[in-house]
UniProtKB/Swiss-Prot annotation:
UniProt KW keywords: Endonuclease, Hydrolase, Membrane, Nuclease, Transmembrane, Transmembrane helix
Bilayer topology annotation: Multi-pass membrane protein
The UniProt record lists the keyword rRNA-binding: no
Protein name: Ribonuclease kappa-B
TM stretches of this protein: 12-32, 68-88
Annotated source species: Ceratitis capitata
Length: 95
């Protein structure tokens, strides 16, 4: 079933591949607690102790990593849809 044209399906392929690469890497950097990404954590500004901060930061890092990996999986679905549409469009032009 044809949903989109050849240009849009190719654009979807390219953007999906880039999104998968970027989100997997961001998830990896969040998972290893990269200091460069600390500004992106949804944590409070003030804590009573250092241990409380470390616990909240580790939890937020892990949650952001999982969110990135879930978004990468959604991009895989978009990649599959775009690849199927590219295949359908290439068969239609070959005949």
């Amino acid at each position: 079933m044809k949903i989109c044209g050849p240009k849009l399906s190719l654009c979807g392929l390219i953007i999906s591949v880039w999104g998968i690469i970027q989100l997997v890497l961001m998830g990896l950097f969040f998972y290893i607690n990269s200091v460069a990404l600390i500004e992106d954590l949804p944590i409070d500004e003030e804590f009573n102790s250092v241990e409380e901060f470390y616990t909240a930061a580790t939890s937020a890092y892990n949650q952001n990593a999982y969110n990135c990996w879930i978004a990468a999986c959604i991009y895989v679905l978009t990649l599959l849809l775009s690849a199927q549409q590219f295949y359908v469009n290439s068969r239609a032009t070959a005949n």
